[in-house]
């Protein structure tokens, strides 16, 4: 039963509960008009303490396509937060007005705190470099629909694996499915944190290896998950400038890749995927973004108990 629950971490739901969400998303994709009144009278509050275009638009569009409405803020300066209001007080007040809330915050753990004081479901829309569970649902749905499975996959994760919350969440999620292999492709400065290796990969006996060049491992991959080097996570601009062009995927590097490999990216991209790749049949990142709207529709409908 998902009604009334929050989603803070991709591990909050069982594999069976995730499948329930994915099946509803499949149904919505097949016939979206059947669900256009599902959330009539319901209100989503978007509490975005950090800039976002795609995630916020995806949540808002998802709620509107369910027939609901949206209130909220897209930067803290436009809310009582700028006056010093705590997260606990903000969510208590928001709970009086809305039926569900989506929160993005630069501090790790902020959505978790909000969920502890909230009387409505809270969805973590990204907290610092920590977790991004709805992007993970998007990634899983896309793999499930294209590869027809979430097990027995070799997944390459490339770019910023240190600060990339989407990568951390996806590694967590994929560790729950059988016989997956993870290939971590990054420069030394942006390697996946040790706690991810110890607490998730090693603890769950997930096979993984590290590489420094895409071309050395691309022929093994069923999925290539590209990420951008995130300027906002760097304290030193010189380090950002030095590392931002570390990995650029182009058609030449795809020559040895499997014909049915899929390329994913949480977006926005900067220059890590050449525009020439957009026309490759393996490029799925824009379809992936659309899947994000559908999976958020399914998730919110389940948490509100309207479907």
Swiss-Prot record:
Self-association state and partner proteins as the record states: Heterododecamer (2C3:3R2) of six catalytic PyrB chains organized as two trimers (C3), and six regulatory PyrI chains organized as three dimers (R2).
Q: What's the protein name?
A: Aspartate carbamoyltransferase catalytic subunit
Name the Gene Ontology molecular function terms of this record.
amino acid binding; aspartate carbamoyltransferase activity
Residues binding carbamoyl phosphate are 54-55, 104, 132, 135, 267-268
Q: So what family is this one in? A: Belongs to the aspartate/ornithine carbamoyltransferase superfamily. ATCase family.
According to its UniProt record, the EC number is: 2.1.3.2
Question: Which residues participate in L-aspartate binding?
Answer: 83, 165, 228
What is the documented function of this protein?
A: Catalyzes the condensation of carbamoyl phosphate and aspartate to form carbamoyl aspartate and inorganic phosphate, the committed step in the de novo pyrimidine nucleotide biosynthesis pathway.
Q: Name one GO biological process term.
A: 'de novo' pyrimidine nucleobase biosynthetic process
UniProtKB keywords: Pyrimidine biosynthesis, Transferase
Per its UniProt record, what InterPro entries does this chain match? Asp/Orn_carbamoyltranf_P-bd, Asp/Orn_carbamoylTrfase, Asp/Orn_carbamoylTrfase_sf, Asp_carbamoyltransf, Asp_carbamoyltransf_Asp/Orn-bd
Q: Which NCBIfam families match?
A: asp_carb_tr (TIGR00670), PRK00856.1 (NF002032)
For this protein, the record's HAMAP family field holds: Asp_carb_tr (MF_00001)
A Pfam family name for this chain?
Answer: OTCace_N
The source's superkingdom equals Bacteria
Pathway where this protein functions: Pyrimidine metabolism; UMP biosynthesis via de novo pathway; (S)-dihydroorotate from bicarbonate: step 2/3
- Catalytic reaction annotation: carbamoyl phosphate + L-aspartate = N-carbamoyl-L-aspartate + phosphate + H(+)
């Amino acid at each position: 039963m998902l009604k009334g629950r929050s989603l803070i971490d991709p591990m909050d739901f069982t594999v069976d509960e995730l499948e329930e969400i994915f099946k509803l998303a499949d149904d919505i994709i097949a016939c979206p008009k059947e669900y256009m009144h599902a959330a009539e009278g319901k209100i989503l509050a978007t509490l975005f303490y950090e800039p976002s275009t795609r995630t916020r638009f995806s949540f808002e569009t998802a709620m509107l396509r369910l027939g609901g409405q949206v209130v909220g803020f897209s930067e803290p300066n436009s809310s009582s937060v700028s006056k010093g209001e705590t997260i606990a007080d903000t969510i208590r007040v928001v709970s009086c007005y809305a039926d569900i809330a989506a929160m993005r915050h630069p501090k790790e753990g902020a959505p978790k705190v909000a969920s502890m004081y909230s009387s409505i479901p809270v969805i973590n829309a990204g907290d610092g470099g920590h977790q991004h569970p709805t992007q993970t649902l998007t990634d899983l749905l896309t793999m499930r629909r294209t590869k027809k499975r979430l097990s027995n996959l070799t997944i390459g994760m490339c770019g910023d694996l240190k600060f990339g919350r989407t990568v951390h969440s996806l590694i967590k999620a994929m560790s729950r499915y059988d016989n997956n292999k993870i290939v971590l492709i990054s420069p030394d400065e942006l390697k996946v944190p040790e706690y991810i290796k110890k607490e998730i990969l090693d603890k769950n006996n997930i096979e993984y290896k590290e590489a420094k060049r895409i071309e050395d491992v691309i022929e093994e991959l069923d999925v290539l998950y590209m990420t951008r080097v995130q300027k906002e996570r760097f304290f030193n601009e010189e380090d950002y400038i030095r590392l931002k062009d570390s990995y650029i995927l182009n058609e030449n590097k795809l020559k040895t890749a499997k014909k049915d490999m899929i390329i994913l990216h949480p977006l926005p991209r900067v220059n890590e995927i050449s525009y020439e790749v957009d026309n490759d049949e393996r490029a799925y990142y824009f379809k992936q973004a659309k899947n994000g709207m559908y999976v958020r529709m399914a998730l919110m409908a389940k948490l509100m108990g309207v479907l």
